Amino acid sequence: MRIAKILLPVSKLFPLDYLITEDLELNIGDLVVVHFRNKELTGIVWELDTNSEAKKIKTIEAKAPLNLSITLEVLELIKWMSSYYMSELGSIAKLVLPINISEKPIKIKEQQVKNHFVLPKLSEEQKQAVTILNESNKPTLIKGVTGSGKTEIYFHIIADYLIKGRQVLIMLPEIALGKQIINRFIDRFGFEPIIWNSSVTKAQKKMILRGILSNKVKVVIGTRSSLFLPFHNLGLIVIDEEHDDSYKQDDNILYNARDTAIVRGKFDKAKIVLCSATPSLETIYNIKTHKYQLVTLANRYKNVDLPNIEIIDMTKEKLPKNSYLSKILIDAIKGNLENKKQALLFLNRRGYAPLMLCKACGHRFTCKFCSAWMVLHKATKKLECHHCGYQSKIFSSCPECLEDETLTICGPGIERIAEEAMLLFPKSKIAVISKDHAKTPEKIAQLLHQMENLEIDILIGTQIITKGYHFPNLTLVGVIDADLGSNNAELRASERTFQLLHQVGGRAGRGDSKGVVYLQSYYPDNIIFSYVKVGDEDRFFTNELEIRKAANMPPFSKTASLILSGFSESKILDIARKIVQIAPKANVKILGPARSLMSKLAGKYRYRILIIADKKFNLQKYLKFWLGFIKIPSYCQIKIDIDPKTFY
């Protein structure tokens, strides 16, 4: 009796035994059609055997259409993911095969790659970068100031791999960033890359997967999930904006796509290129320890000047009530508009106001399901929780003390800034971009097109606008609240603030005119601002690494979080304490249990246990051994977060 263990793309499932018929020849990695729970699914041949402990064994129906298969390298990646991130094989297989490709034959469109590409002439600095990248056998970071032409450099590397007939993956933190890159790609290479993100339809996914498996798809531009596409001939992985937190998935399987891409590159023997003007501290550490190679671009493309950085001391500004733009910034915007230039106002806070409260009794409007304030959205006339999506009406009186006319709103969101800008600049064309105002890639592309065509004078946006966009006529950036996030107790608060300010400032002055960036702050002496002002990221990285080393925190150590959640706070805390009490003795430091920064989410109370260990310590083996001593009750959900990026 011939048996195959079939890995199905079903969450929390391990490989299952199926019988191989006499006329069927199979190899490990082949895709086959099997029945599972009254459904016909496509699975991966995981192992071949002659014995099975199962009493009733179903038979493999057939090979998948076109005799498609998964490479041994992708199988190795699945195994590594399961081991490193302590996740079930079936959950990871679902990332590789997110759709049943055996359903209905579908036409596969082949990308027509020509060997003649229209690539712009590079500067001497860029040519040297391309040479280093071609010769490097390590993951290589292109670290360049904003507007230095990092994209054009990796386009030259892509051209080499396309000529060799290899497949290429370009990873972006958000596909919203992709529209400008896609257009530039088409201009340079003469064909359209395949796009892979959450908005791709089921039918499109099926077509793309078959195209990749049959080597008819050559170039994919996608978000973090594109990393798991089953390429057969992958030669190059580009990780653009490698520092971005969007590469970390914080639900289902908790994994870092940037780090996993590095591992995939090793399995596939693919070149890895990372890009960022503000690299992550982990990447800087890997360069200093010679695991990665560094390519530096000190100058903007065509030697365009970097913007001036001006810090506005808001303690000295006398603002009218409910106003948030300083006189200095207002005057600068007026001058900018007179010169027919565009401006960007940045505030990383959605909605109209982050808090509504009662002046009589102090009642704050918080989410009934989360430990978070309800955000006022004036356009929809709703209070909304940005964590679970719960909405409520805007009250006319306090629901706690029942007093009338005592409710007030505190602080600005971008809708409030837009309202102020419209009053100050009534003749200007003003647009707002955030997850609320641009919910689809198409809407984002429309706003970007309007900016490029000078149909917008002032763009007001959240973090979504900081990610690598190029607007030649944008010469002024105003950061409304530069303090936001920097006083956070999070490990990476300083790093994120520096990256965010540097990135948003980098949108200014990328054309022929010099740019200027205004940072409004109530703490102008914050050392982060001095690093941003002089553009001294190297000194910032050195200082931050010294702080991390003194605290024995990543990248100088390994960390993992155990996140426990459930509807009864006392029961969850009790389980968390028991877990800590039974921890085996080892060379690790255990902190907690403590309430998560987001102590209640979607109705569930949340506690964290943080484990810190030496870099060489096998943390996964220790956690598996430790958690084997306790049975987690059904009322408690536990997640293991290896290399956590946040502690919310």
UniProtKB/Swiss-Prot annotation:
GO terms for biological process: DNA recombination; DNA replication initiation; DNA replication, synthesis of primer; double-strand break repair. PROSITE patterns: HELICASE_ATP_BIND_1, HELICASE_CTER. SMART domains: DEXDc, HELICc. Zn(2+) 1 binds at C358, C361, C398, C401. Its cofactor is Zn(2+). It catalyses: Couples ATP hydrolysis with the unwinding of duplex DNA by translocating in the 3'-5' direction; ATP + H2O = ADP + phosphate + H(+). It is an enzyme of class 5 (isomerase). It holds the Pfam family Zn_ribbon_PriA. Residues 375-548 form the Helicase C-terminal domain. ATP binds at G144, V145, T146, G147, S148, G149, K150, T151. Keywords: ATP-binding, DNA replication, DNA-binding, Helicase, Hydrolase, Isomerase, Metal-binding, Nucleotide-binding, Primosome, Zinc. Residues 131-297 form the Helicase ATP-binding domain. Binds 2 zinc ions per subunit. SUPFAM superfamilies: P-loop containing nucleoside triphosphate hydrolases. It comes from the Bacteria. Zn(2+) 2 binds at C367, C370, C385, C388. InterPro entries: DEAD/DEAH_box_helicase_dom (IPR011545), Helicase_ATP-bd (IPR014001), Helicase_C-like (IPR001650), P-loop_NTPase (IPR027417), PriA (IPR005259), PriA_3primeBD (IPR041222), PriA_3primeBD_sf (IPR042115), PriA_C (IPR041236). The keyword Nucleotide-binding applies. GO terms for cellular component: primosome complex. GO terms for molecular function: 3'-5' DNA helicase activity; ATP binding; ATP hydrolysis activity; DNA binding; zinc ion binding. Its EC number is 5.6.2.4. Initiates the restart of stalled replication forks, which reloads the replicative helicase on sites other than the origin of replication. Recognizes and binds to abandoned replication forks and remodels them to uncover a helicase loading site. Promotes assembly of the primosome at these replication forks. Belongs to the helicase family. PriA subfamily. Component of the replication restart primosome. This is Replication restart protein PriA. It comes from Rickettsia prowazekii (strain Madrid E).
